[in-house]
Amino acid sequence: PGFFDDEVRSLGGRIFMGPGLSPLKYPEYLRYMKTLLDREKEIKVLHAHNEAMEFYALNGAKKAGFPVRIAHAHNTHLPRGLKLPVKLVCKEMIPGAATDYFACGREAGIYYFGEKRWNESGVLIHNAIDLERFGYRSEVRTRLRREYQLEDKLVVGSVARFMVQKNHTRMLEQFACLKKIYPNSHLLLAGEGELQAAMEEKAK
């Protein structure tokens, strides 16, 4: 299940659950994409956001006959780990599998697609956030501090997905130093993700 599943369905959208994006499941993924396109003929566009591993989705869509295949870059580096060599190879093959190249910033676009391709056909898509919803409101501040018993505390907050790029490990280490100077300080981390349990354990 995804975080936005209910919202997608409430707006009339449908969700198709495919195989995981991994080298071992690639043949299965190709068959899935072909079956999906044969069954859902109104689908003409695939928009992928899976870092380097989006190559599998894009190339599967290409072989299945999707006419529009959008690669969307969000990062300027790939995290270190056992999968890094595979991800680096996949990243280099993304441009050949996509028809359109989106990025949330110029640096991310150049990293994934190369400077020449980005300058010629890259599309900059700013992350869409309604700033009005998150503007400062004194009444909200007062209510939340009272609700969480933080009225006279120093509060540090972060809203971010629990993933390597957001560096919650460093955040917790820095806050531990702050706590020694200001014992009445509190750190609030809002988000979810694959590292949430690990960060909860580290915070203890």
Residue positions per predicted region:
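N-terminal strand-loop element at the rim of the active site
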Residues: 1-24, 28, 108, 193-195
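A conserved, positively charged/aromatic
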Residues: 9, 63-66, 70-104, 113-118
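Nucleotide-activated donor-binding/catalytic signature segment of Leloir-type glycosyltransferases, i.e.
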Residues: 12-14, 200-204
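An amphipathic, basic-hydrophobic alpha-helix
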Residues: 14, 19-45, 55-59, 63, ...
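A short helix/loop element that forms part of the nucleotide-sugar donor recognition site in Leloir-type
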Residues: 33, 135-150
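Short His-centered aromatic/hydrophobic patch
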Residues: 48-54, 73
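Carbohydrate-associated surface elements
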Residues: 107, 128
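A conserved mid-protein helix/loop that constitutes part of the nucleotide-sugar donor-binding site
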Residues: 154, 158-183, 187, 194-200
